[in-house]
Design a protein with these regions (language model features):
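Short glycine-rich anion-binding loops that position phosphate/pyrophosphate groups of nucleotides
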Residues: 60-62
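Short, charged/polar "capping" segments at the starts of alpha-helices
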Residues: 7-12, 83-84
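Charged/polar, solvent-exposed surface patches and flexible loops
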Residues: 12-15, 19, 90, 97
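Helix-adjacent hinge/juxtasegments
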Residues: 14-53, 58
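Short, conserved loop/helix-junction motifs that constitute active-site signature segments
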Residues: 65-70
Length: 122
């Protein structure tokens, strides 16, 4: 599930996923179609109706109740936007407070570097 409250972002993701990779495409659909439950990747703003094992949160989207049980929950945000950084920190605190494992990754010099990690409470 790719979740964004921004309709323009959802439309851009939809268009991009039809075009890449060059030798194919990533099967997906926009939320609200007749086959939402069958989509390998569902793009929308609501809950995952496609048995998603992971949720990608974009543009300040919030996790929904029960999504802490997902295999993975990604929060993508602009590290140069203080409001987005503060919101991501709040999500980190809430999610780790629920006992979820968490990792913070930052893009540096064209590669991803893990900055910190919180293991689940045992």
């Amino acid at each position: 599930m790719l979740r964004s409250p921004n309709p323009d972002r959802r439309d851009r993701l939809d268009a991009k996923l039809w075009l890449e990779p060059e030798d194919g495409f990533l099967p997906h659909g926009l939320e609200g179609g007749p086959f939402d439950a069958d989509q390998p990747v569902l793009i929308g703003q609501g809950g995952a109706t496609n048995a998603a094992q992971g949720v990608v949160l974009l543009d300040g989207a919030e996790p929904l109740p029960g999504e802490e049980a997902c295999e993975r929950l990604w929060v993508l945000f602009d590290g140069d936007d203080p409001v987005a950084v503060q919101a991501a920190r709040g999500l980190w605190t809430r999610m780790t407070g629920l006992g979820m494992a968490a990792q913070y990754w930052s893009e540096e010099t064209r590669r991803w570097v893990m900055k910190t990690e919180k293991k689940p409470a045992e």
